[in-house]
């Protein structure tokens, strides 16, 4: 959806894609064995969808752990508690399902304040990863000759 793309536009590594590619990605997710329609929450206002929380049944082989795959709020609606509400709703659902814990991955340098949100709801850092990346775009020669 457009709302999902806009919510992640300022996320590390974001690259925009045509709507048909986004639809295809959603189809792939929805056919995954980890997908559950009851683990998707939307925040809406008079303009439409302004926030989304997509969770998966479990985190890989960790069957007792739920996984927050994608949590995002449109920039104009950030800072009013929507992400917190969406996140706490998923925690309650996982607790109902008997999960022992919930995990997610986050860009620790996110300009959105995501790490403050997660620590504010009681989550803590269990693993820190540093990724190195070189962005290569078609038509841009980066080789030093």
Residue ranges and their predicted role:
Residues 80, 84, 109-127, 140:
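Conserved active-site alpha-helix within GNAT-family acetyltransferase domains
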Residues 75, 104-114, 132-137:
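Conserved beta-strand-loop-alpha-helix junction that forms the acyl-donor binding cleft
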Residues 78, 87, 102-105, 118:
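Hydrophobic multi-pass inner-membrane translocation pores used for secretion
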Residues 1-21, 144-145:
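Short amphipathic alpha-helix that is part of the acyltransferase structural core
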Residues 12-71:
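A conserved beta-strand-loop-helix scaffold within acyl/acetyltransferase catalytic domains
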Residues 65, 94-106:
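Conserved GNAT acetyl-CoA-binding A-motif
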Residues 43, 77, 81-89:
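Conserved acetyl-CoA pyrophosphate-binding loop and the N-cap/start of the following alpha-helix
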């Amino acid at each position: 959806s457009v709302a999902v793309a806009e919510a992640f536009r300022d996320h590390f590594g974001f690259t925009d894609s045509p709507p048909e590619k986004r639809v295809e990605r959603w189809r792939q997710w929805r056919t995954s064995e980890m997908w559950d329609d009851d683990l998707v929450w939307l925040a809406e206002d008079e303009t439409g969808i302004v926030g989304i929380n997509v969770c998966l049944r479990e985190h890989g082989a960790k069957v007792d752990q739920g996984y927050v795959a994608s949590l995002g709020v449109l920039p104009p609606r950030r800072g009013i508690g929507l992400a917190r509400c969406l996140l706490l709703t998923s925690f309650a659902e996982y607790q109902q399902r008997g999960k022992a814990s919930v995990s997610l991955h986050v860009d620790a340098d996110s300009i959105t304040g995501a790490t403050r949100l997660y620590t504010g709801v009681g989550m803590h850092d269990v693993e820190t990863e540093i990724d190195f990346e070189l962005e290569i775009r078609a038509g841009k020669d980066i080789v030093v000759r």
